[in-house]
């Protein structure tokens, strides 16, 4: 896992926080049952947004997996929408007029994630905490907030990234 985090943070080793398990807090819009749920159908959008904003696509995919399980129509009980579960104010600020549109949502979410990575000097754990709990909470606690949900969220993303790196290594070895 450390190698994966090092790759995502420009070579710096980030120590993972002590965390509890994450909770999943989203509802699936009824229309989602008709939707194709193959995550690879979003690869081109993710790759394009990742390249544009300089964010590792593995990190973006892990965030999407944790946030919505690649359901572009996911809506949380608090109003977060789409693949990257953007809150209405963030969606508006980052140009996602329709946060349930996969492309608008991913581009806005990746830009927001890029801004958080810049704010925290490439520290992926702090950027993820900011994405989950908001930058105000990260500033107030001078680090990852002691919220169970946020600590679980950061750990979940780190585990998804590490799992993706392991799966890629296995696939490469099989080729």
Give residue ranges: language-model regions.
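Cell-wall glycan-active module
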Residues: 1-65, 159-175
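Second-shell loop/turn segments in exported
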Residues: 29-37, 46-51, 72-77, 92-102, ...
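Short, well-structured alpha-helical segments
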Residues: 43, 47, 57-61, 103, ...
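Solvent-exposed coil/turn segments that connect beta secondary-structure elements
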Residues: 66-69, 89-91, 162
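Substrate-binding/active-site groove segments that recognize
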Residues: 73-97, 105-117, 129, 135-136, ...
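Surface-exposed, polar/charged faces of alpha-helical domains
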Residues: 118, 122-125
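Catalytic and substrate-binding regions of cell-wall glycan-acting enzymes that process beta-1,4-linked
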Residues: 127-175
């Amino acid at each position: 896992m450390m190698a994966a985090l090092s790759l995502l943070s420009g070579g710096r080793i980030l120590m993972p926080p002590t965390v509890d398990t994450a909770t999943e807090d989203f509802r699936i819009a009824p229309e989602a049952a008709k939707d194709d749920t193959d995550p690879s159908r979003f690869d081109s959008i993710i790759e394009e947004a990742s390249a544009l904003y300089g964010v590792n696509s593995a990190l973006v995919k892990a965030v999407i997996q944790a946030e919505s399980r690649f359901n572009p129509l996911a809506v949380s009980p608090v109003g977060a929408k789409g693949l990257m579960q953007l809150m209405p104010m963030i969606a508006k600020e980052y140009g996602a007029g329709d946060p349930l549109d996969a492309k608008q949502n991913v581009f806005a979410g990746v830009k927001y994630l890029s801004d958080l990575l810049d704010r925290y000097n490439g520290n992926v754990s702090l950027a993820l905490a900011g994405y989950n709990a908001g930058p105000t909470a990260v500033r107030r606690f001078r680090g990852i907030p002691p919220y169970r949900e946020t600590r679980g969220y950061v750990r979940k993303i780190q585990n998804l990234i590490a799992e993706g790196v392991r799966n890629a290594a296995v696939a490469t070895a099989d080729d």
